[in-house]
């Protein structure tokens, strides 16, 4: 009875496994050739029936059936694992395809999404920051107390007399010895054979003191360099004023030779600047001479220091006098004389007709009947600046000439030259359309006309007039800008 029951139980278990296999669709994987019951009956028949079996035989059969069940169970587990993706590459690929179509990404999805984000970030540029106003390197160092005031607002305040006295910076630019080197040197030619630097240095220093030209104790001349092969020398002074005074030694006799004293070739009169070591007082009495100039049309609110600053943009003054009334207020005109006579014509050409506030300057020789000294310059001041002084600043044209802005040394370096070009173009573009811009540059040892001047061509005369009114009197590299109109034909023919 117990054997029969065991057989029935095994048959029920096997049937349950077959039902599960059919539902899984893998019946073919578990088709047993003989069931447990058949095996048992065959075993019984081979032994002559079940009655003669002993306990050992039953135990062996039970262990055998258990092993068979375990084997079949492991086989079915492997089959189900393969069908569910454990070993089927095709099913796994189809599963991933379904996931991608449904929006899933599997293991590679985070990496793919990261790539999309990266591509999207490349396609979508970052929002640009608002462009800050350009800070010019050269234009307008604002006076103390007016750091937040625009140049145009400051000029309008000046015209209205709203700028208090003493608010303008010192007229003496802050420059070092290297900047003024060319203005502190003199060329000495026809030097005697066999002279040495020490002897020449002692000779000139002695003559400076004997003639009363030294403006302070000590040696006015600091350095002497002799070129014996070409028979000339260069002497370097401690101050610009004493350098100018040293030109009086042209023709002096030294060791039997008559010396030639000249300015060096790279000297530019309009770019003369102060040496900080020389702060000699300017005489307040301007004596009548061929180089005395009259400055009229001055706004009454301008102080003496402000007028001197304007004049000193061309070079140091020998004497200056601003006419005032009994209350100390300006009468609107002044007289001046430059320490270097060669600057007289240049200053007249640059300042005459300049617009200051609501007034226009009138600058001319004060003593026209006096005989002029030979300054080695053309007699006509208009030939210096290329304008007609009889018409003030000249007839308005599309060409604006800006003077007293740049030095020859500043134009030699390419990077600095490009920066100056950019600064001037950007500033002039605020007042109209700039068609072209010319800043003549020095070329080795060859003289180039117009070096030190800036020429700007505007699209219309009205644009040029707006720029002229706005830029006159402005500061560029700590120099006061002087402006005038320029002939269109001369500009296009490059007659600078």
Curated annotation (Swiss-Prot):
Coiled coil: none annotated. It is found in: Nucleus. InterPro entries: Nucleotide-bd_a/b_plait_sf, RBD_domain_sf, RRM_dom, U2AF_lg. Residues 184-266, 291-368, 404-488 form the RRM domain. Residues 1-142 are annotated as: Disordered. The keyword Nucleus applies. Residues 1-26, 78-96, 105-138 have a biased composition (Basic and acidic residues). Forms a heterodimer with the U2AF small subunit. Necessary for the splicing of pre-mRNA. Binds to the polypyrimidine tract of introns early during spliceosome assembly. This is Splicing factor U2AF 65 kDa subunit.
């Amino acid at each position: 009875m117990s054997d029969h029951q065991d057989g029935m139980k095994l048959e029920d278990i096997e049937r349950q496994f077959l039902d599960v296999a059919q539902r899984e669709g893998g019946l073919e994987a578990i088709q047993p050739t003989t069931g447990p019951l058949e095996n048992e009956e065959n075993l019984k028949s081979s032994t002559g029936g079940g009655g003669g079996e002993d306990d050992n035989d039953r135990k062996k059969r039970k262990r055998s059936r258990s092993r068979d069940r375990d084997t079949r169970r492991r086989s079915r587990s492997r089959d189900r694992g393969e069908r569910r993706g454990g070993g089927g590459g095709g099913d796994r690929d189809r599963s991933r395809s379904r996931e991608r179509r449904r929006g899933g990404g599997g293991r590679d999805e985070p990496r793919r999404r990261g790539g999309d984000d990266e591509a999207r970030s490349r396609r979508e540029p970052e929002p640009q920051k608002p462009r800050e106003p350009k800070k010019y390197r050269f234009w307008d160092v604002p006076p103390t107390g007016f750091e937040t005031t625009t140049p145009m607002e400051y000029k309008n305040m000046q015209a209205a007399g709203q700028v208090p006295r003493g608010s303008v910076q010192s007229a003496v630019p802050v420059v070092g010895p290297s900047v003024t080197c060319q203005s502190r040197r003199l060329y000495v030619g026809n030097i005697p054979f066999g002279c040495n630097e020490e002897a020449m240095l002692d000779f000139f220093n002695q003559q400076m003191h004997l003639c009363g030209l030294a403006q302070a104790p000590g040696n006015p001349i600091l350095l002497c360099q002799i070129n014996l092969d070409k028979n000339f020398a260069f002497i370097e002074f401690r101050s610009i004023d004493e350098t100018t005074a040293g030109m009086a030694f042209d023709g002096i006799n030294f060791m039997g030779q008559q010396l030639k004293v000249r300015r060096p070739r790279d000297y530019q009169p309009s770019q003369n600047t102060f040496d900080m070591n020389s702060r000699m007082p300017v005489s307040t009495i301007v004596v009548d001479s061929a180089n005395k100039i009259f400055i009229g049309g001055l706004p009454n609110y301008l102080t003496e220091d402000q007028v001197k600053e304007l004049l000193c943009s061309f070079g140091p003054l020998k004497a200056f006098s601003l006419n005032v009334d009994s209350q100390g207020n300006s009468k609107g005109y002044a007289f001046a004389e430059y320490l270097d006579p060669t600057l007289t014509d240049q200053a007249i050409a640059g300042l005459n007709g300049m617009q200051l506030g609501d007034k226009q300057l009138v600058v001319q020789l004060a003593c026209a009947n006096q005989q002029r000294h030979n300054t080695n310059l053309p007699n006509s001041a208009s030939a210096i600046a290329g304008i007609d002084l009889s018409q003030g600043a000249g007839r308005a044209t599309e060409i604006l000439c800006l003077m007293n802005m740049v030095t020859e040394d500043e134009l030699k370096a390419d990077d600095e030259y490009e920066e100056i070009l950019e600064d001037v173009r950007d500033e002039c573009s605020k007042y109209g359309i700039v068609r072209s811009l010319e800043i003549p540059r020095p070329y080795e040892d060859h003289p180039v006309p117009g070096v030190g001047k800036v020429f700007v061509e505007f699209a219309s005369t009205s644009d040029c007039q707006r720029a002229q009114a706005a830029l006159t009197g402005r500061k560029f590299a700590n120099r006061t800008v002087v402006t005038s109109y320029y002939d269109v034909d001369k500009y296009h023919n490059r007659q600078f």
